Design a protein with these regions (language model features):
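Repeated scaffold domains used in trafficking and secretory/extracellular systems
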Residues: 175-183, 238-245, 291-302, 339-347, ...
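Short, conserved, GDST-rich strand-edge loop motifs in beta-rich repeat architectures
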Residues: 191-212, 256-271, 309-312, 356-385, ...
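Short loop/turn segments that connect beta-strands within beta-propeller blades
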Residues: 222-225, 279-283, 323-327, 394-398, ...
Length: 581
């Protein structure tokens, strides 16, 4: 049977079982057409807008007939979502066409339905048989596993049974004088913090750009967006910045450190990887502690700080909890117990679960496996990769409670909704998925911009904002894609910074802040109008990663209210608790 036959079979199958006749009133057809037009998945409004005037798809106000629509089913592959999900019958198409005419203000001639039915029957006579092609053994093998359903149906648990908790013997290897405060916080005000590195991309900046040689901690005013102060860290403490993190009480910031120092104070090539603890007022390091891995991301977790890591030492952890009071690694999880490599980790707003983005081993040594795999997909070396998945960790028992494979490669980022019903996963393979947390069911998967990385929900959780970094592809992405969270369709593609990396909703729920580690800037968007408000240049355009907001109450008591992991300390615009500043 030809492709056209299969499509037309769907269209005409309802003729015998759908007893709608020409006597049905025009009003009834229009009403039925409206229901179909606005169906959530597969409905016309998704692409053509609720009025039919066009969104991503063109305007329909010319009044397409049912035959025009069927022609698009055959000729336009994008329309397959309609035939698969809406599955319209002959009478459905008649109703849709009448409804579109009502939207366009065109005449609703009672003779049209009968005319259209005759045209649809005539259309069948134009069908031609589909040609048959020989399939190779490779193609047959690929067909057996090409659908995501086969991943779910054959999934086997990767993690060990029981607790995956392990410990790491952290050591304090450096203490430093905190110095003098660089600014004086005011009661009732909110401040943003940013760790800034030395690895911006000169090619996307101005002629003669010279990168900084020192990492910095920057603090600014959340209301005015202006930088207040910054401090350059000693070059001997330099490493590659990938995150900004803060203790729950807003007193201490954390930054990636080099390997532990040798006798002369320079990093020891054979030493353990370290992290720096910095005073949030003086902006200077006070402690250097071994953590057994190069720091990647960090976020508040209960009264501790949760980190995930890049390169692990032999005894290092893929994720760990850090005690800001005792300055020690309490423990965490090793990759080997998870059955794959931990990339990033994300808690829900109540800290009830930790969701680890997991990578299959073997595409490169150690934790580089996922990045290497997806890079080779973009470069054409690989046609497919082994599955990536989400591991659901109970932080009270430290058992892996569930594993959910995802339809994409190398998950970078995840956002859990305020109801803790769904997790939005953003993949380097230029797609994102909405996953039901109760059972791992994929609600939708939608396309993003090239090589996405970070993401954030808007305040009412109707939009997922995604930073299109170019991860794995070319690292020159410069857009922000916005997806409708109900159906996963893109609604906007915004101009952004080169290598836009993280995007976060501000604590007031009104702005989206996007950090660029290519330009060394922060772009701030109005979350409602989507307009770019200001750009904030980091000192010397050092690369910007992550964001933290710290609020001081009327008594001058500090609290971290937002970081890249979630909102904290009672602030959450999605729960009706925005911070007014």
């Amino acid at each position: 049977m030809s492709i056209r036959s299969r499509l037309l079979l769907v269209v005409f199958a309802g003729l015998s079982c759908n007893a709608v006749t020409a006597q049905d009133s025009v009003d009834a057809l229009v009403e039925r057409g409206g229901e179909l037009f606005h169906t959530t998945v597969g409905g016309c409004a998704t692409c053509h807008g609720p009025t039919g005037e066009g969104l991503v798809g063109p305007s329909l106000h010319f009044g397409p007939s049912p035959v025009n629509i069927v022609d698009q089913f055959v000729a336009n592959p994008i329309m397959i979502v309609v035939t698969e999900n809406l599955n319209p019958t002959n009478e459905d198409l008649v109703a849709i066409s009448m409804y579109i005419r009502s939207l366009a203000g065109l005449e609703l001639d009672p003779a049209l339905p009968s005319q259209w039915r005759t045209e649809l029957v005539a259309l069948e006579s134009l069908d031609t048989e589909e040609q048959e092609f020989r399939r190779t053994e490779y193609e047959l093998a690929m067909e057996r596993v090409q659908r995501f359903d086969t991943v779910v149906e054959t999934w086997e648990r990767r993690a060990i049974e029981g607790s995956v908790w392990s410990e790491y013997p952290s050591r304090i290897v450096g203490r430093f004088d905190a110095g003098e405060p660089k600014f004086t916080p005011e009661p009732g005000k909110t401040y943003w913090y940013e760790n800034v590195g030395t690895t911006s991309s000169p090619s996307v900046l101005f002629d003669g750009y010279v990168p900084p040689t020192q990492n910095r901690l920057v603090v600014g005013d959340a209301a005015t967006h202006e930088i207040i102060a910054s401090y350059a860290i000693d070059e001997n403490l330099r490493s590659v910045v990938h995150t900004s993190a803060m203790s729950p009480d807003g007193r201490w910031a954390y930054m990636v450190g080099p390997r532990e120092p040798s006798a002369d104070g320079t990093p020891n090539p054979a030493g353990a990887w370290t992290m720096l603890k910095l005073d949030a007022l003086t902006l200077q390091p006070v402690v250097q502690v071994t953590i057994g891995a190069r720091l990647h991301h960090g976020q508040v977790f209960r009264d501790k700080v949760l980190f995930d890591t890049f390169v692990r030492d032999p005894d290092g952890l893929g994720l760990f909890l850090y005690d800001p009071e005792t300055d020690e690694v309490l423990g965490g999880v090793r990759d080997v117990d998870m059955g794959g490599f931990i990339y990033t980790v994300w808690p829900d707003h109540d800290y009830e679960r930790i969701y680890a983005m997991m990578e299959p081993a073997g595409y490169a040594p150690g934790r580089s496996t996922g990045m290497r795999g997806v890079t080779q997909i973009y470069h054409g070396e690989y046609q497919a990769l082994r599955p990536f998945w989400i591991a659901v960790i109970n932080p009270d028992t430290w058992e892996v409670e569930a594993e959910y494979p995802i339809p994409g490669y190398r998950p970078n980022w995840a956002v859990i909704d305020s109801a803790k019903e769904h997790i939005y996963v953003i993949n380097s393979s230029s797609n994102a998925s909405k996953v039901r947390l109760s059972d791992g069911e994929i609600i939708w998967t939608g396309g993003t911009g090239i090589g996405p990385y970070g993401g954030s929900l808007n305040a009412d959780e109707t939009e997922l904002w995604i930073a299109d970094k170019g991860e794995g592809a070319h690292h020159l992405g410069r857009t922000v894609t916005i997806l409708n969270t109900e159906d996963g369709h893109a609604t906007h593609s915004l101009y952004g910074a080169y290598k836009v990396d993280h995007v976060l909703l501000s604590p007031n729920g009104e702005e989206m802040w996007a950090t660029s580690n290519g330009e060394g800037r922060i772009y701030i968007y109005d979350a409602k109008s989507k307009e770019l408000i200001p750009k904030i240049d980091m000192p010397e355009n050092g690369d910007a990663h992550g964001l933290i907001w710290v609020h001081y109450d009327e008594n001058g008591q500090a609290a971290t209210v937002r970081d890249q992991g979630n909102f904290h300390n009672g602030v959450n615009p999605s729960l009706g608790r925005p911070l007014d500043y």
